[in-house]
Amino acid sequence: MRTHYSSDINEKLQGQKVTVCGWVHRRRDHGGVIFLDIRDRTGLVQLVFNPDNDNFKVADSLRSEFVIKAEGVVNLRPEGQENKNISSGKVEIIGDSIEVINKSKTIPFQLDDFQSTGEDVKLKYRYIDLRRPEMQHKLITRSKAIRYVRNFLDNNGFLDIETPFLTKATPEGARDYLVPSRNFNGKFYALPQSPQLFKQLLMVSGFDRYYQIVKCFRDEDLRADRQPEFTQIDIEASFIDEAFIMSTMERMIAGLFKETIGVEFATPFQVMTFADAIDKYGSDKPDLRIPLEFVNIKEDMQNEEFKVFSGPANDPQSRVIALRIPGGNDKLTRKMIDEYTKFVGIYGAKGLAYIKINSLSQGKEGLQSPIVKNISEETLFKVIEKTSAKEGDLLFFGAGKAKIVNDSMGALRAKIGEDLDLFNKDWAPLWVVDFPMFEKDDNRLYAMHHPFTAPKVSSVEDLVNTNPEELSSRAYDMVINGYEVGGGSIRIHKQDIQAKVFNLLGISDDEAREKFGFMLDALSYGTPIHGGIAFGVDRLIMLLTGTTNIRDVIAFPKTQTASCLMTEAPSTVSLEQLNELGIAVKKEER
């Protein structure tokens, strides 16, 4: 139907007849001449119809979002009327003929006025919202990124192998989406939270290198960077170690960013231990573009009478830290400090102490804060020395249980970095390694990553004789600008170690056999050393396109209640369907 896309129309085609198809983006009548901006996925091109044209009446009748096909001759625009904002801006098409393929009702919102349109309206009419050039750019970038990844992995010997969507429920932390079986009454499939076990079984099968661009499903409470269904770049390889995975993935991600948006990452990426990340930034996914670090002052506060600090300072499960904000005296108002106090309260902090450093030569008198009177001058100036604070700086303090301090002050660090625009570079990729094998909650151990991550032990005897809370794992996460974009590990490849890890997690032998018997059996039939990683496609595309909402990079996303406003899913089904599946719906009591 067409000879060219809009972006193909340029001065090289001057005098040539072309055919274009698309939507009427804008219609203007200037002195009896009709100007039409025609939009397709590549951009805009201007179409001109003069009054003496046989199709002038048709052109005059067009309205926004009509779908048309037009023929005409490419002509240079009059001098001074070029449009530098579009690739076809030096030319226009002098229309010969035009065909209305389809009319359009008045759309629910104007594409140029999307910012004043509610999110619910845009999701209900997603097919309209996706016509916006900004949205099309994001999804085109997604397509290019996935194509690059496929080519890279194909060229490096990885095989694209599909794994099942209807599988066994083996909870991995979040709730499963369950699918009832019609053939086996009362039994259910689960939609996979990841292809974890299947990709390991492919290594047992001898395929050596595997990848898949795959949908995964988690029935969990949603955030701005989460969706119930999401896409992973899933990767596994045999006879490898951490260095192989990390170096290969660095090449892939560095190449992806260069190819897609022209950004060059220095390799190898910085490597940081989990312990260092928590100690310095309160987070296992720190944004290293922000030049603010925690300073531990626990020992300095142990003998102070100020119980807010000395209490946690003498508690092994707590920490006391200072966070220096250079020039914070002038940059942070009292109102902002009050807002930050409320902000850290979201994470469980009981308050936010601070000290403004007005003068270093006046002793305590040069320090401004409600807490100054409660702490000795000697300790105050030790803290100032430790933090390298200068006149005009402001110190924030976190004191309490380690998790609360890490979460609250880590979030505060990121917020201040954004509020004050402290970013010292555009991109900061790194690896976080040496994660704890387990984390403890309610006096029970949980896998920090998942139960198939290999611990840093060489035998089951080492595993038995080591305090589980002191075990490190062979896990690694890739972090870019504060986002965990990928996570993986070397896997357990010996049956006795896997069985013991299940045991440490409180999974009985019978339960392990019921849920993971097929995996335990496979590990007894000659399993190679293997490991892998999974990248969140949606998060990567967020970074590549500069958006902060995952819904912007998915064609048809769900809301924060996991519903689709466009199709009205989830929906009820007929009683006949329920009876066929042997399911009775329990009505919610109100």
UniProtKB/Swiss-Prot annotation:
Its main location: cytoplasm. The record marks 30, 80 as: Important for tRNA non-discrimination. InterPro entries: Aa-tRNA-synt_II, aa-tRNA-synth_II, aa-tRNA-synth_II/BPL/LPL, Asp-tRNA-ligase_1, Asp-tRNA-ligase_1_N, Asp/Asn-tRNA-synth_IIb, AspRS_core, GAD-like_sf. The gene is aspS. GO terms for biological process: aspartyl-tRNA aminoacylation. Its EC number is 6.1.1.23. Homodimer. This is Aspartate--tRNA(Asp/Asn) ligase. It comes from Francisella tularensis subsp. tularensis (strain WY96-3418). It is found in: Cytoplasm. Residues 196-199 are annotated as: Aspartate. GO terms for cellular component: cytoplasm.
